[in-house]
Amino acid sequence: VLGNTFHLWLRPGLDVIARHGGLHRFMNWSGPILTDSGGFQVWSLGDLRKISEEGVVFQSPVNGDRLFLSPEESMRIQRVLNSDIAMVFDECTPYPATRNEAALSMELSLRWARRSRVAFDAEDLGGGVVDALRESPSDAAADAANQAAGRPSNGLFGIVQGGVFEDLRERSLECLLEIGFEGYALGGLSVGEPKEEMLRILSHMGTRLPTNRPRYVMGVGTPEDLVEAVSQGIDMFDCVMPTRNARNGWLFTRHGDLKIRNARFKDDLLPIDPECTCPACSPESHGDDRAPFTRAYLHHLQRTNEMLGASLATLHNLHFYMQMMREMREAILRGRFEAWRRDFSGARGQGIE
């Protein structure tokens, strides 16, 4: 899961998370956790922030306090959060931006990336684990170093910026590779640019990212976006879409998207997707002998703003995304990705019954 460094820093604050020993115990989650650097949230504050070489001064959206965030402070906060993957502090290049504006922003992000790397290593977030990951991409090497060091594996990912300019993106990646990171992300996508521009940069940069490190696209996207990105070699994604859309009654299915608030579903006795095995569509698949929740019931819950409606929709959408990614991994292993992709696209275009 992804932890939002900026918001966790403000609420509940680092003290309470530190007393738990980090996010894993705080949220009772034993799986991997990635934390962003806070850069995107600071960028989104607009007029409430002021950027300099040292970092960003901004006004807290919670209580109006004047706060300062820098590469070093971001690394310190992420150390307290104790995530498995930390992200460098960067400036998200806005759209639209001139080539000169994008270049200046990208160069600032590179200087901040170097400072993030130094601060990350000095904070001993990774120690021997980071060194082992640099020398070998194998899990065994990382696990051995982790065991010897007596601490969890942690890694720092670099973020490629440069807006919609391919040569700037290439320079950003080249410099990040010189610094050296445990993984590489494409940032500054899906920030208002046309879909064609996003796909062009993704196509240009996806296969240029190193194949012996995790490749991550930040803030993307629709099911179709993820399929396209995987075809370009991308491994990891984060996006609010499955959960935010769920809260608004927008459900993803194998045969297209379903807007459960629409009147046509008021009396519909089918589950969201009869082929789905999520807890909402198929409780029996999860040891529950109840019948599936019907579209009519989900329609009622959404229309009356009942919390259960958002919860069931979220479970469904997350299950859909996880199942889609699982199928893509299996198709790649079997050498059938393109065939799977055609079938998936065809089914998604059929529409909901």
Regions found by a protein language model. Name each.
Residues 1, 36, 78, 158, ...:
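Conserved, mostly hydrophobic/aromatic
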Residues 2-130, 139-147, 257-258, 263-266:
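Non-catalytic, usually N-terminal nucleic-acid engagement modules in DNA/RNA processing proteins
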Residues 7-9, 40-41, 93-94, 163-165, ...:
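Short, solvent-exposed loop/turn segments at secondary-structure junctions
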Residues 74, 105, 109-112, 116, ...:
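Alpha-helical packing segments of well-folded alpha/beta enzyme cores
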Residues 90-96, 273-353:
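C-terminal extensions of enzymes
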Residues 94-99, 103, 183-189, 307-310:
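Glycine- and acidic
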Residues 107-110, 119, 123-133, 138-146, ...:
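Glycine-rich phosphate/ribose-binding loops and adjacent secondary-structure elements
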